[in-house]
């Protein structure tokens, strides 16, 4: 497909580890315990602070501007490398407004219980922790209003890939 894929969650984790300005902002806001003695991010501590002490918006306000800037840089890199398509995978993409730097937004929807199961398994956390995180996310209905296309992830991974490829082909055909 020639797609450049950027995963915002991975980008945020990398920036929180490597971006010295962001690290300093996090330490100032959340304390030295935000990072382990080896300099690695203390994800457990930050997750507890954010989700149990209602500081999610505070953490997001620090991290998201850095992710947006990194996204713009990634888009430029993808263009230089002649990728046909730039894909940003981001659960929190539409938290505030529709990003002006993206031409088309596709919402991939799945049953909430399936999402909880997938994230719990991926992150090695309890389903209750995932539910608490999801409470900070916008509802599917509000996100649907800001998207151009919706893909239902109600089958296998291969079925999802087929749906995505079909949409990409439709978009390419409409450009011609």
Language-model features, listed with the residues they occupy:
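An amphipathic alpha-helix signature
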Residues: 1, 23-27, 112-117, 127, ...
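A conserved segment at the C-terminal end of the G1
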Residues: 1-7
